[in-house]
């Protein structure tokens, strides 16, 4: 082992930490990180923790926000995701005994379109994917070493993956089932198989027991109602997309197809002209890894099955070939429709590529034809994932730039503190997601998190052909007064708004001057009092 390999092996943790800092360096500025599915909550208290309905990951995040501030927690959380992704890949490739292969795997788990998109928009899914990858690491080590400690760690990672995003349960189930069944074919030990399934299932149940119990006892109705309200229309709205003129089959093979990519909400990996060359080279490495390890490697064969099934399910209803399978699952498997965004299955493709590719690197570097250039080729292989998703560096630098809440929002908050009301405060425009000028992008509306629990705000999806899943009486009453895009105009009896709101115990209306706020000009015509107005907000008193 030469000095370069010794350095890479000795300081791998520092190197992956440096990579994480490089990717996230813009977040070191002051402010909050506003993302599509990450509610910015600057004033978290114990009252914001719902012990019977929040996953342990959410409870932990809120406790951390109380201890070190939400802004600091955001940075640590993102840094931890990227760092642990790198370490997971490095550890996954440890059986290769090749440090270049380990770096290829670690960098690939960080630099790929799937993780990039989720870090940019849905960091909880990125964190859940990291937990899924660590589940694979510990499960494979357990099967190789038969040490219970490894199984306990695998069970914990399985539980965390589900806690971060509940429908990863299907991904966990597929990965675990296929790998354990392949192991049973070799071991022929039913007791070992049953013990493994039991421990992994127990890990999922224990780490999610509180919100699962809350759902069964009716204490977690919002989570349950959201899933119950999903329909086949949701599957069509969140269908996996063909990106950049490629077929949907190749798009998913290249770890893309997330609907957010189609909307150009962040820099695409395809903006880099070398992305496809790098991907095809890594595809060759993965293929070589499969070929060289097929006969002797249980994980290789198991991951081929996992990859094939996950690829089909990730494409889902976007393909006339695979649509019948997805539609059958939506109709017959409980809660599968909750996985309305099938592209999440791509996480398992990422895992498979990292594993196979690392073995491809190992055997490429063992080839006598490159004996005089082994170090150079090894570094080139390490760099391939970075070239593949090179746009991720600039993309995250742009997308994760922090922003401050406007001073006008703080003025409104001070007004509410000085003129408190016992009832509710309706926040308009009525959107769950809105293009907020101070956030610089379309994000989940942070009104309740900023102004307090009295706020009633939009819970409507408004994506594709899906407007909302809310069926409660309060929401339906409010939505009588909301003009819905792409729907026929109807006469709205605005004069009934004050008595309807009073019946809901709404005493103030707060209108943010963003998006379609001018569609709410009728508030000035129905005889309610305007008590505050600035450049960002208007507050009305009923």
Label every model-predicted segment.
Residues 1-15:
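N-terminal membrane topogenic signal
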Residues 5-7, 186-197, 284-325, 367-376:
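Membrane-interface helix-loop-helix junctions at transmembrane boundaries of multi-pass membrane enzymes
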Residues 16-22, 83-92, 100-184, 196-216, ...:
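Membrane-embedded helix bundles of polyisoprenyl
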Residues 16-85, 107-129, 234-265, 318-322, ...:
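Membrane-interface coil-to-helix junctions
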Residues 38-47, 63, 115-126, 230-231, ...:
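Membrane-helix boundary/interfacial segments in multi-pass membrane proteins
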Residues 42-44, 50-55, 201-203, 207-290, ...:
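Periplasmic/ER-lumenal interhelical loops and adjacent helix-loop junctions
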Residues 77-88, 128-131, 279-282, 349, ...:
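Transmembrane alpha-helices of multi-pass, membrane-embedded glycan-processing enzymes
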Residues 147, 217, 224-236, 265-269, ...:
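Extracytoplasmic
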